[in-house]
Amino acid sequence: MSVCTLSVPVSSLSPGRRCNTFSDSGILGCVPINSNTDEEDVVEEKMVAEGVNKEAKQPAKKKRKKGLRIKGKRRRKKLILAKKFSKDLGSGRPVADAPALLASNDPEQDEESLFESNIEKQIYLPSTRAKTSIVWHFFHVDPQYTWRAICNLCEKSVSRGKPGSHLGTSTLQRHLQARHSPHWTRANKFGVASGEEDFTLDVSLSPSSGSNGSFEYIPTDPLDDNRMGKKHDKSASDALRAERGRFLIKSNIVKHALIPGTRAKTSAVWNFFYTDPQHISRAVCNICKRSVSRGRPGSHLGTSTLQRHLQATHPIHWAVANKDSGAVANGLDEAETERSDLLSDTLHGEKSTGSQDLTAEDLSDSDSDEPMLEVENRSESPIPVAEQGTLMRAQERETTCCGNPVSSHISQAIIQMIVEDMHPYNYFSTPAFQRFMQIVAPDYRLPSETYFFTKAVPQLYDCVREKIFLTLENVQSQKIHLTVDIWTHDPSTDYFIVTVHWVSLETASFLNNGRIPDFRKWAVLCVTGLAKDCLITNILQELNDQIGLWLSPNFLIPSFIVSDNSSNVVHAIKDGGFTHVPCFLHCLNMVIQDFFCEHKSIENMLVAARKTCHHFSHSVKARQILQEFQNDHQLPWKNLKQDETGHWISTFYMLKWLLEHCYSVHHSLGRASGVVLTSLQWTLMTYVCDILKPFEEATQKVSVKTAGLNQVLPLIHHLLLSLQKLREDFQVRGITQALNLVDSLSLKLETDTLLSAMLKSKPCILATLLDPCFKNSLEDFFPQGADLETYKQFLAEEVCNYMESSPEICQIPTSEASCPSVTVGADSFTSSLKEGTSSSGSVDSSAVDNVALGSKSFMFPSAVAVVDEYFKEKYSEFSGGDDPLIYWQRKISIWPALTQVAIQYLSCPMCSWQSECIFTKNSHFHPKQIMSLDFDNIEQLMFLKMNLKNVNYDYSTLVLSWDPEQNEVVQSSEKEILP
């Protein structure tokens, strides 16, 4: 326990009165303390007041002294609180109030009130106990609420327990694992020694690191050398990639010496164990994944229990390790030493391969019978028979719970239900479910709720993150795209979602099986909770963190970022130097919502329609009457469609449902009071549905995987043509009200600010140019005043930039160059490269270097020739769907530079339909459901739900293990907590 000193000036009170005042409070010590002041101003002798008035025994002349004199000079005494403090901070007044007591005007009241308040109110100073946990390098105690700690990275206040109870660090560890997993993993890997300097995360990234400990992405020039590093410096980055790739794995990896400041681990047991990153007083076995205690926290942590675990559970491994440890000294043959190396390599193989365990059967196949007998004799001798039997029975229970394949499959299925169906953790702890499991699998022991929350789901979360990270390592294109969404489903929290999109042209087997290939890939990088009042800097910082975490280690560069028109998000993207593309679906939604608000008749009709649907959805009797009427008249029945606030498509489906059941609804509403839809409103509802029908079709086209920026201009053109046809139809029929509605919506569609910006944006126009389906009818899609030749020059500049940055990709292989069908349409730039080839047909390296270092004016005519050749080629429809990437996959060897530019523009999505499907159609993400789950863990669950089907994760590869005895203790404690 560390000692905290408080300097208190001596007042006019006599020592006797002061000791009488302090005698009822506890033990007061005055000891010499070294300080920066003069030696004469420090107390050199110890005086202890133990609750007995010793001043009564002193001579009267000493009582008349105004202060304490030592060696003839007046001193200032140092009061030291020797009363035993609690190991954690109490719930009393914050420590920050102590200096205020010292600054009081009355010295006598200062000394008495300070000491009494520290003893009676139990104000525990922060330095009363050394913080040995590594989490304290990322947290500091909240000065206002001492039972909470503030994260140094995100400044979030995290609770450590209830006031007055034990304050631990488990919640702080879970916060670091969920919100700052790279920082926490690398801290465990490299360590922070007690008493050393503060730990700083040293991550080698192409982006620069911010001063606040998080990543700051700085976009570079397109022709910068960093963008060419993926091709030129790939060998030099292998070490960085291997090191950064391991940040995702916090389990199933042998981590030696996780806790810094400890002595070197010389015991042989550490070849079979690694320190548990969540509980430093426990160690995890590399063979069976069981967590074994090394002692009580805060006491001496030995290896005796680890040795007993190896002797009882893995006697063969332990005996061979003991035998091999003396191989050199005893002069054993080389075969024995090689077997030792093989065993050691097998045990440590989990660092790179996962979980390949060496069992006793594997050793028995390779070793003779005599060493086996010797091993058994050596393993039985060190421990008593009774203790060995107890450990063996515990191992049998663990094998029954974890080693049984059926039990593993059941546990994996439960985790799958938690993630995919968003079941709460306590659902599997209910008596009904436990009775069901007793009938289905009597021998299965259900893990505790805490196990699923703290071990199973985080382990699955890490595995999926690792798989996504390894997939991004193999992305061929250097430029990828991001979609950013913020969804509000919590009273105090918004969820920040970042999704990455890229293209992989390696899927070439569709010609054999006849299926359309899926070139477009995507993955959710993060689901992070942000405060409602988060600033632009917080959003930009989180975006830079994700880019530095996922993209920069793989030399990937964000080309376009798609988001809605939220002011904070748009400003954050632009302030970061990124290219922002508005979400097409959000633009349509804003146009139609403004159209609804502009017409009062439509608003009144929607209010009546919502009341009608609410009447049938909340009244069982009304719903039964409606269904009976449908059955009596043999009318088809469809489920009721509810309207969602802020989404026009749900409003359209609600109106469409009412029109399909208009006869039944009108008949049923006659019996209900207060719910009426007039005939004029029914007619207006028909007009609105006819007008919105083209927009619903456009939404369906946008929500498919193959939709990209190439369809923005054609879809807007198609919507305007559809509204024009509707206007002509209404004009022929003489419906004035419908004509006014069509004209109003057409005007809004043409004058909308966001849509007008998208029509004139360079990414959308170039993406349309690179779609072979639209290249022959571009004049119909282009806005007024746009020049086609100007945008062809822009496209040629993009091709020229790519030729200059990646000249080696623009070469044609020798085998392909010899084919006449390929060389006919080859790049002019590639043809110039071929002129520098030698007689043997190989490309001259000096010629390639000269071209690569040539001026941009030399490459631009070649790029223009490639673009002209693309537009002159006649495009014919082919069987393969509407995805233009199928066309460009066939042209990658003919126009390599133009193909790469086409992939860059065609791979950008029009909207973020992935998060749309999760948050708008899935009822599991209601605010009540989210608030009932843990905040840090709900982010992991949403991340898994959005990624598991996309990455095709195999649950059978998830290795699960738990301690049955500890599981029973946790389950019993959970039952006591539950009402």
Swiss-Prot record:
Expression sites by tissue: Expressed in pancreatic islet cells (at protein level).
PROSITE patterns: ZF_BED (PS50808)
Start and end residues of each stretch annotated as Required for nucleolar localization: 1-89
GO cellular component, one term: chromatin
UniProt: Zn(2+) 2 binding residues: C285, C288, H309, H314
Comp. bias (Acidic residues): 359-373
Annotated region described as Disordered, given as residue ranges: 207-232, 333-383
Mapped zinc finger ranges (BED-type): 130-187, 264-321
Compositionally biased residues, Basic and acidic residues: 337-351
Modified residues (Phosphoserine): S381
Descriptive protein name: Zinc finger BED domain-containing protein 6
Species in which this protein is naturally found: Homo sapiens
Lineage: Eukaryota, Metazoa, Chordata, Craniata, Vertebrata
